[in-house]
């Protein structure tokens, strides 16, 4: 296994090797799409299973007190989550991705990706005015970045791979075949 990883690292580290980068981008795109599909299921399944609504988008069918309780409970969970995290782990969303792309060459840390997943799922399920597209961008870029980091991809190629992850995540988020 170590030999294969060394050979793969040598293959993709060459600046003129576009085939290795294309294969890695394909893998990152598939992984990002799977992550976003699981994220959407993590949002839609609890809504349909536990709330008396017909569609995951129809919070107006809930009573006034149910909406208030749902929002309050979700807010409390999010406050406790972000208050307990160190400052460097609180970065989530599109602005975090842009900052990491600009100042850290596409290195997106895994803990921030996990926080994004959990916080966005709680916010959306509890009825906050949060869309799934912003978290999808972070989750897609983060998934691709983690794949690139695991194979030792160079900075300039890691940024390209993170962009491929974003495109795949947006495509999966909107149920479109290609971004």
Q: What label would you give each PLM region?
A:
Residues 1-179:
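Alpha-helical transmembrane segments and immediately membrane-proximal extracytoplasmic
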């Amino acid at each position: 296994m170590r030999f294969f990883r060394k050979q793969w690292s040598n293959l993709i580290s060459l600046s003129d090797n576009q085939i290795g980068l294309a294969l890695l981008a394909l893998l990152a795109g598939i992984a990002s799409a799977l992550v976003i599909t699981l994220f959407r299921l993590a949002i839609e399944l609890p809504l349909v299973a536990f709330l008396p609504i017909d569609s995951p988008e129809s919070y107006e069918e809930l009573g006034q007190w149910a909406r208030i309780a749902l929002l309050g409970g979700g807010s409390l969970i999010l406050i406790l989550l972000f208050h307990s995290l160190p400052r460097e782990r609180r970065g989530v969303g599109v602005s975090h991705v842009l900052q990491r792309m600009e100042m850290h060459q596409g290195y997106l840390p895994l803990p921030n990706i996990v926080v994004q997943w959990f916080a966005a799922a709680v916010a959306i399920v509890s009825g906050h005015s949060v869309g799934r597209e912003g978290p999808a961008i972070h989750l897609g870029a983060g998934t691709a970045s983690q794949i690139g980091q695991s194979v030792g991809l160079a900075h300039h190629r890691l940024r390209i791979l993170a962009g491929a992850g974003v495109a795949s995540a947006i495509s999966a988020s909107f149920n479109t075949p290609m971004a």
